[in-house]
């Protein structure tokens, strides 16, 4: 859950987001070390009067500054490729939910059930109850079972949208005529908020997403009441 003046990432709720957080810290450490080294070299060049104007060739130095960046790029690329593979891999999903973007709301269809589908609109500020979040609450939440792999099929009816829930490490483009997929797995119950992350028109800012992750028993009761 995000909070005012937050400086870091949202708390990870899925295995993918945990991996992304660790990768962020790993990459940030490498960038910090490189930046410190470059600033140190620049400071030496500005403060020292020692120069090598007669140096015409330095094969050892050239070898080092060719190999070292390649090694650093490999250290960044390998964990990145691993996470990309994890995000694309979907094995035996327990549930499939089709998400369609519209100007300016989302519609959801639980494809494993015959008549379980609904539209999800933002609740206007004037209709909010005490404790509800402005521009983030919806009239119909997406209820999903926790601790189970869920496949989200994402597309659009009109223009480009993007279905994003930061605490779950999700951001998938909704493209007209194309069906993208993502995996949702939550480690704990709760409400998780997101928004459309692709500028899609004048009301782009009013397309919130709310996932309600519940135990499997509660999800079965909810789905039975919705059919």
UniProtKB/Swiss-Prot annotation:
Gene Ontology terms, MF aspect: copper ion binding; cytochrome-c oxidase activity
- Give the main EC class: translocase
Q: Where do transmembrane segments lie in this chain? A: 15-45, 60-87
Signal sequence annotation:
none
Q: Which residues carry this modification: Phosphotyrosine?
A: 218
Q: Which reaction does it catalyse?
A: 4 Fe(II)-[cytochrome c] + O2 + 8 H(+)(in) = 4 Fe(III)-[cytochrome c] + 2 H2O + 4 H(+)(out)
Gene Ontology CC: mitochondrial inner membrane; respiratory chain complex IV
Task: Write out the residues that bind Cu cation A1.
Answer: 161, 196, 200, 207
Question: Which EC numbers does the record give?
Answer: 7.1.1.9
| Residues annotated for Mg(2+) binding in this entry | 198
Cofactor binding description: Binds a dinuclear copper A center per subunit.
Q: Name one Pfam family in it.
A: COX2
Report keywords, A-Z.
Copper, Electron transport, Magnesium, Membrane, Metal-binding, Mitochondrion, Mitochondrion inner membrane, Phosphoprotein, Respiratory chain, Translocase, Transmembrane, Transmembrane helix, Transport
Q: Which residues bind Cu cation A2?
A: 196, 198, 200, 204
Which InterPro entries does the entry link to?
Answer: CcO_II, CcO_II-like_C, CcO_II_C, Copper_CuA, Cupredoxin, Cyt_c_oxidase_su2, Cyt_c_oxidase_su2_TM_dom, Cyt_c_oxidase_su2_TM_sf
Query: What superkingdom heads the lineage?
Result: Eukaryota
Q: Where in the cell is it found?
A: Mitochondrion inner membrane
Needed cofactors, names only, are: Cu cation
Assembly and partners are described as: Component of the cytochrome c oxidase (complex IV, CIV), a multisubunit enzyme composed of 14 subunits. The complex is composed of a catalytic core of 3 subunits MT-CO1, MT-CO2 and MT-CO3, encoded in the mitochondrial DNA, and 11 supernumerary subunits COX4I, COX5A, COX5B, COX6A, COX6B, COX6C, COX7A, COX7B, COX7C, COX8 and NDUFA4, which are encoded in the nuclear genome.
NCBIfam families, alphabetized: CoxB
Protein name in the entry: Cytochrome c oxidase subunit 2
């Amino acid at each position: 859950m995000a909070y005012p003046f937050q400086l870091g990432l949202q708390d990870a709720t899925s295995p993918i987001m945990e991996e992304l957080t660790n990768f962020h810290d790993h990459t940030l450490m490498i960038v910090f070390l490189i930046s410190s080294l470059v600033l140190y070299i620049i400071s030496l060049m500005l403060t020292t009067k020692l120069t090598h104007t007669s140096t015409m060739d330095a094969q050892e130095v050239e070898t080092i500054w060719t190999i070292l960046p390649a090694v650093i790029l490999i250290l960044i690329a390998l964990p990145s490729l691993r996470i990309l593979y994890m995000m694309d891999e979907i094995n035996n999903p327990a549930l499939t939910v089709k998400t369609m973007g519209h100007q300016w709301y989302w519609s959801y269809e639980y494809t494993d059930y015959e008549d379980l589908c609904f539209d999800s609109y933002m609740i206007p500020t004037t209709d909010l109850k005490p404790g509800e979040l402005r521009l983030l609450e919806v009239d119909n939440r997406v209820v999903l079972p926790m601790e189970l792999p869920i496949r989200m099929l994402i597309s659009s009816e009109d223009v480009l949208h993007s279905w994003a829930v930061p605490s779950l490490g999700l951001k998938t483009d909704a493209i007209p005529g194309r069906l993208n997929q993502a995996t949702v797995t939550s480690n704990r119950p709760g409400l998780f908020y997101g928004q459309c992350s692709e500028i899609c028109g004048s009301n782009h800012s009013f397309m919130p997403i709310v996932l309600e992750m519940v135990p499997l028993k509660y999800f079965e009761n909810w789905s039975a009441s919705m059919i």
